[in-house]
Amino acid sequence: MTWTQVIDPCHNRLASLGVALVPVLAIFWALIIRKMKGYQASLLATALALLVAIGIYRMPVTLALLSTFNGAIYGLFPICWIILPAVFLFNITVRSGQFTIIRHFMASITSDRRIQALLIAFSFGSFLEGTAGFGAPVAITAAMLTGLGFNPLYAAGICLIANTAPVAFGSIGIPITVASQVTGLPELAISQMVGRTLPLLSALLPFYLVILMAGFRRAKEVAPAALVSGLSFALIQALSSNFLGPALPDVLAGIGSIVSLLVLLRWWRPKTIWRFPDESPSADSAPAATPVLVPSPADPAAPPAPRTHLLWALSPFIALTVIIIIWGLQSVKDWLNATGTLTFQVPGLHNAILDVNGHPIPHLYKLNYLSAAGTAIMLAALMSLALSGLRPREGLKVFTSTLHQLRYPILTIAAVLAFAYIVNDSGITLTIAGALAASGVLFPFFAPLLGWLGVFITGSDTSANALFGKLQASTATSIGVDPVVTVAANVSGGVVGKMISPQSIAVAAAAGGLVGRESELFRFTVRHSFILLAIICCLVLAQAYVFKWLIPVYHLHSLH
């Protein structure tokens, strides 16, 4: 049995667009207005998408159900396989007492929550995005900030927004590599174009984060830190993406930003230490709503731990960093893929759906159990368990409690990926994309919105580029705009959709202890997603028609 996708099931583009938007808007309605829990909103959206796919798009029931099930399985592996070991590793550090030492160490650097957020959420998170990606950075940094005493909502929300800067070059540049593969455009040209758009956002983001946390007046107190953090990151991101390609910008910019900020803190400190409400001057406990300010001539902190204790406490994150770097090496990745990958054709679904041009769509399930980022994190967690001093029985207890802690996030993520797969396979996303592509000369303005939508639905900039990259290139060519502008816009627009993707929300909520409060987290980030998206849309429109000198010179391959 085969079935061909349709873009205009109602034989009226406006009516088809309205129907296609129903399951997408349902997520916004459920989380913002009804304030549903994440798994409830995701299951509702998936059910609506199934009804639209079967009832309006005439997708066979069997194919629709298989597509939904395939998405849910993908949600379990590799996505949940990242979150489970990441939270397990963090819980080991808490149970062993290692995180208490880390908390005191962070306080010895600075107990100011604003600067802690810059170091961990922005800089360290960017480094992790460059090496691991796919949810791991948000899971790890949100857990760390919550453990340091951040308000859980702010910890998760700040990490989601901070993750905007590095997503385009995440996982050793895989989003741009995929964009190049599906469009035929040179990888370096796309990297250069993205590297001439995102650094402006990256430079402003640290200050934006601090304003979000503490307000404009208190943000001015740490303006030197925000400027050093943002400008060092943006400069390295721009240079590396333009001269080295997409593989290293996040890693180099993350390290450069951390080093620059630590150098600044050697001779500069904020005049006041800013903390969340209900924190005493020396507290590291969870905060509330009004900040506490205390004089900070010397930034008092807990007595520093002996170096050997500190090294032991940091060993889980050192192991994590080293293993993730090793896992990211191309030669290692190739060997792991060759040794430990099982690929299955999805029964009843593989090549059963034809795209609008009549080409069969392959549905393969890839179980790369060795090269998966989650495997690297689990290896680091097991090494950390061995070094933690916990007995195996205690480690097992930590693992089972982690599973219990993540039971609803796992359900949420499975439902979100089920939703993503059914709206893609049924053609619902193509209907929405086609409407945006019909905007003519204004298409460059809407091009980032397409990437934003793709990441909102799939939770992945890589998937959004695979989904819409070719459409972006062909539409740009048809209106006389350089296709590298709109393909790069798809990448750049996608990064600001990540913070509101239900998949990302579920990951951050699980790591930050906000299970059941996903709607609060969604409302926390959604406004900022739209603000940053509007900035990128205006930038891309200007690049397409006004600042054409920003477009890199490259040899145009034929689109395929």
Segments from the language model and where they lie:
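Hydrophobic mid-bilayer segments of alpha-helices in multi-pass membrane transport proteins
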Residues: 19-28, 36-58, 80-87, 226, ...
